[in-house]
């Protein structure tokens, strides 16, 4: 083959390779922009939203509806790992910024966010959680006998939400086949007894009641009487439970709250971890950044979220308020 033909063929391949490289780069760039600014897909990893949203469901997170949260680190994780540093240096962290959104955050929204209780990792590297939004900044929230009360209005149970039940089944009618037919996926028999603990919707509870000819089904009240060790509701000796607590005022940006030794535990994580202050309590006196205080003004908005699987959800009742800078987006 003549030399000039070889050169032409080689030049043709170079040109095709260049075109493909440009096309792939543009496509990857567009996908990255969509992922960062518009949408993200997520597989639900827990049962905390059963039966409204199920474990294994694929959901689409809309980031722009609340306003896209801009990237919070200069260097991607890959560069930190390549340098052999497993920590994320402070100089790589960017301040929290969010673009204008098309929607306001509202009661009952399904919100995806980074888990606020992981204080050892950058916010955007914390695990994704999905919950229902119960209370907004400035709302007054309480819970009585498992019913949330927001600004004096008692919320109805959500249609597909689950609660824990005790089922006494002396004739062993409730077997695996029955559970499968009723789509009951959580709970089981207490070893060596005819008692089952099941997480059920109201319709499932009604079906169980019809099936068992003897025995009984009733709400599992052990959760009400059981202290949740080290949880938000138990800090500072506050004897609240998952089903009965409050009232609590949800912190809002620029809201000023009185502080004392009785309520400081509710706001400790906000003051120290989310708003980066030093906090000390000495002889019933409170010091923030070495200054005596009896009040505090919040720098951000906060929210209260909960899972529809009421007795099997790690949510604000366990780890506290959700800061606005942890919110990723909305799903439906």
Briefly describe each language-model feature range.
Residues 2-332:
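Extended hydrophobic leader/signal-anchor segments used for secretion and membrane insertion
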């Amino acid at each position: 083959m003549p030399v000039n033909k070889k050169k032409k063929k080689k030049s043709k391949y170079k040109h095709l390779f260049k075109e493909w490289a440009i096309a792939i780069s543009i496509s990857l760039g567009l996908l990255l922009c969509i992922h960062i600014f518009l949408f993200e897909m997520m597989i639900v990893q827990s049962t905390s939203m059963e039966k409204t949203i199920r474990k294994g469901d694929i959901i689409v997170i809309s980031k722009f509806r609340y306003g896209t949260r801009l990237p919070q680190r200069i260097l991607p994780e890959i560069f930190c790992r390549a340098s052999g540093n497993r920590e994320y240096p402070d100089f790589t962290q960017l301040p929290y910024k969010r673009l204008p959104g098309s929607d306001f955050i509202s009661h009952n929204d399904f919100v995806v966010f980074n888990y606020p209780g992981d204080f050892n990792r950058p916010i955007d590297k914390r695990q994704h959680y999905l919950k229902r939004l119960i209370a907004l900044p400035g709302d007054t929230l309480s819970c009585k006998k498992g019913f949330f009360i927001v600004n004096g209005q008692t919320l109805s149970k959500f249609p597909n939400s689950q609660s824990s039940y005790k089922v006494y089944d002396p004739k062993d009618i409730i077997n695996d086949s029955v559970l499968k037919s009723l789509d009951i996926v959580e709970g089981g028999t207490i070893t060596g007894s005819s008692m089952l603990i099941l997480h059920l919707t109201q319709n499932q509870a009604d079906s169980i009641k019809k099936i068992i000819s003897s025995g009984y089904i009733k709400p599992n009240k052990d959760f009400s009487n059981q202290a949740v060790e080290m949880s938000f509701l138990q800090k500072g000796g506050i004897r609240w439970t998952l089903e009965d607590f409050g009232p609590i005022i949800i912190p809002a940006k620029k809201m000023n709250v009185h502080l004392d030794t009785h309520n400081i535990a509710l706001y400790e994580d906000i003051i120290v971890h989310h708003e980066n202050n030093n906090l000390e309590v000495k002889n019933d006196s409170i010091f923030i950044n070495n200054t005596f205080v009896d009040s505090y003004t919040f720098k951000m908005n906060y929210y209260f979220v909960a899972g529809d699987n009421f007795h099997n959800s790690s949510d604000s009742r366990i780890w506290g308020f959700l800061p606005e800078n942890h919110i990723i987006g909305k799903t439906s």
